[in-house]
């Protein structure tokens, strides 16, 4: 959640953020009213409790003849105290509810607007020029017997697939290359749970308006769409030592997404699916270091795409396209020849202290005082990379030139049937 002090003391900052997101500003006033109601309820309860304490002392020192009347008054006062406590709890619940509904405050650096207002920061690599009509990744995958969508649909339904033979080997090679890069960069590897408790999913900001995008089991547990969720909850209710710098993890997991809002989009191939693999970077840092850490995460993603010899561009995502938890987000988009356009293959988000406040993840400074850490995340490798690899490295006969960095992992220079 956002810092309550910012909401109370400088509400215009939150109003501007809501405006940039294209969302209602009325929730700011609703939350401020709820806050005032809470303060009133607290004051009322504390006043009655003080009266109760005074009356208790009076009863203790009273004459026997006065005690029955004092006890009658005490019973009435006890009922008022009970009601006041309930009103305070109700007011606090309403305040917390509204506070949880407000998305993170958008960075002042994030562009205004929707998708077409995203700012391209840079473009890297040469777009391949083919002397033939480039095939799409599914055609290439089927020719190589590497991707089997039809049997995926038969077994599990639409947007499912099998990776087979070279397809499976290629994904594992990509993941291992990313893992090697992560370990050499000092990240700690985690293999994370893919089922999490509701409070962890809520804490990361994936419920509320995004609840329709995640799978919920009858038990109440949720399937995660990214290991970010599990890693964010890994240190919940803890005080971390970040005096030596950021705490960085790389979490591998299968990921599950309903893609509820994607009807009719990317129905061909494995660009947008319900299950995929991902290696996610996640950092806990001092809030003042979050901007620098975001740049570090993006630099790691760029290294990975450069190793895979994929042309890409980095875009600063417009405010209306940001998720609930993100204050700022960069997308790295790969060139997809069959579509003659750039498509997002990985992203990096600065969530500032938003998730840490919800999950109670703190640090202790040199004076002994605690504060909330900032959390950041970014994908280092995912199944979607296969789309870019197959299409950008295809040859006229349908074989795939293996990027040099993957050759030791695959044991050959070309993938062919």
Curated annotation (Swiss-Prot):
Keyword Cytoplasm: yes
Catalysed reactions, as listed in the record: tRNA(Ser) + L-serine + ATP = L-seryl-tRNA(Ser) + AMP + diphosphate + H(+); tRNA(Sec) + L-serine + ATP = L-seryl-tRNA(Sec) + AMP + diphosphate + H(+)
Keywords noted in UniProt: Aminoacyl-tRNA synthetase, ATP-binding, Cytoplasm, Ligase, Nucleotide-binding, Protein biosynthesis
EC number assigned by the record: 6.1.1.11
Cellular component annotations (GO), alphabetically ordered: cytoplasm
One of the protein's GO biological processes: seryl-tRNA aminoacylation
A Pfam match: tRNA-synt_2b
Cellular localization per UniProt: Cytoplasm
Annotated L-serine binding sites: 226-228, 280, 379
Pathway assigned in UniProt: Aminoacyl-tRNA biosynthesis; selenocysteinyl-tRNA(Sec) biosynthesis; L-seryl-tRNA(Sec) from L-serine and tRNA(Sec): step 1/1
Binding site for ATP: 257-259, 273, 344-347
UniProt-recorded Gene Ontology molecular function terms: ATP binding; serine-tRNA ligase activity
SUPFAM superfamilies to which the protein is assigned, alphabetical: Class II aaRS and biotin synthetases, tRNA-binding arm
Function summary: Catalyzes the attachment of serine to tRNA(Ser). Is also able to aminoacylate tRNA(Sec) with serine, to form the misacylated tRNA L-seryl-tRNA(Sec), which will be further converted into selenocysteinyl-tRNA(Sec).
PANTHER family per the UniProt record, alphabetical: SERYL-TRNA SYNTHETASE
Quaternary structure and partners: Homodimer. The tRNA molecule binds across the dimer.
NCBIfam families, A to Z: serS (TIGR00414)
Protein family membership: Belongs to the class-II aminoacyl-tRNA synthetase family. Type-1 seryl-tRNA synthetase subfamily.
Domain remarks: Consists of two distinct domains, a catalytic core and a N-terminal extension that is involved in tRNA binding.
Protein name: Serine--tRNA ligase
Species of origin: Tropheryma whipplei (strain Twist) (Whipple's bacillus)
